[in-house]
Structure formats: C-alpha cells, structure tokens
Amino acid sequence: MKLTFRIEYRTAWGEMLGATLCGNDNQPIMLSTGDGIRWEGSAEMTDAPAGIPISYRYGVYRDGQCIRRESGTMPHIFCPGKKRNCHYILDDFWKDLPQESYLYSSAFSGDYQSANSIKTMAPADCSITFRALCPCLHHKHQQLGVCGRGAALGNWDCKQTVLMEEIQANEWTVTLNAASLEFPLEYKFVACNADTKEVEEWEAHNNRLLCIDGMKKGEIYLTPESEVRFTSSARKVAGTAIPVFS
C-alpha cells in the first residue's frame, strides 16, 4: 500500500521534515515542500496486517540529524484495511502533548481494554476516515460519535449518529464511503451513552468543515486527529482560601 504524509509546519532555513513508522527512527521518510510550510512525502509499505494500528510521527531534520520530534507518548495512528493496493493519504497537524494532557492519563480516562480486532476499516474504493482524540469518556460510560450534514452522517439527527471505535486509548476513528458524503461536509463530534447509543452531549466546538475534491479509486483520506472537548469534561477545581495576616 502507498502512504502519503501531509502536514503544515513552518521550518527554518536548512530544516526538513520526515516521518518515521512504528518507532523506526533510523529510517525517516523525508518530505518535501515548495514554501517551507506545507510538507508532503510518500512511501510504500508492505505486509501490513489488516485491523492492526500502525503508529508514526514527524521530526525536524537538519544535516541528516533529527533536532526535534513530536511527543512520543501519543504518536499518530491509523488502521489499514483488508484491501491491497490502496493509497492512504494521512493529513496531520504537528502533535505535541494535548492541551490538557492530564486528562489522557488512566486516572481520568480509565483503563483502555483493547479489542481482539479493529472493525473500522475502509469499506469502499474511496473512503474517508475521521480521527479524533477524546479522553474521559470511559468514566462517563460513553463512546464518541459523529453527526452532520448529509444522509451518511444523519442530517444532524442525533438518532442517526455514526458511532466511532476506540482503536487506542482515547483515539477514536470511523471510516465511511466517500461516495455517500456531501462536500463541503459539516459535522460535529458527539458523546453517546455506551449502552443506549443515545447522544448525551455535543462537542463544545463550531461545526467542523471538510472539503475534498476529486478522490481517485483506491484512495483513503484520513482527517487530522482533532482534539475533542465536551463542556462536562471541563476542568473543575475546588479549594479553600486561607487568609494570611502579617
């Protein structure tokens, strides 16, 4: 299968970007740019088992040496499907620690129980994979979903929400047939009850917008891994103020 990495990152003169797969930091896939901001590069990957998450991360290189790397605690991930000869287009943001990284610890997010196999895989020749980062759902007995414009996303009807699958702790994904989606696509992430599947909360974010033109047969586009926040998960601090007199 072919992998294409896309990321925006402003580099200094003499710096380049590279991507490394599965922790293999000694063999980076070097990217190229025309403006020093938008970077892209491709590579072939063989013998990737279907449904098993593949991790990767980006680094900044100067004179062949890596001088900065993304946070290693939460690499980018995706799950290849059973179909061969696919072209995965991985659209990314630079990934440092999440804004509220403490929420991603097991103390706040609970223990992740990995499934025997990942169900979320490319269902068609042209597919879109939605990716999101969202902690704290286990403690509230919830799972992530996506709802939006068009029949495939329920036409904003929360009863028709598309449920997502957790493929790593706090990392959620779902893959849909691109032909069933209407572009430009507006959507939002929602928190659903893990038992009833009913929507309990909409994310605290404006409608998200996805614009894609002219996908080719065999292409699978993966959105950047967006951080999803819900009002109910906002930080709550309690304490006592003690006056000090001099």
Model segments located where?
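Basic K/R-rich, polyanion-interacting modules in nucleoproteins and related proteins
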Residues: 1-11, 93-137, 230-245
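Aromatic-rich carbohydrate-binding modules that target alpha-glucans
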Residues: 2, 10-53, 61-81, 136-182, ...
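Structured interaction patches on ligand/partner-binding surfaces of diverse proteins
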Residues: 62-112, 192-238
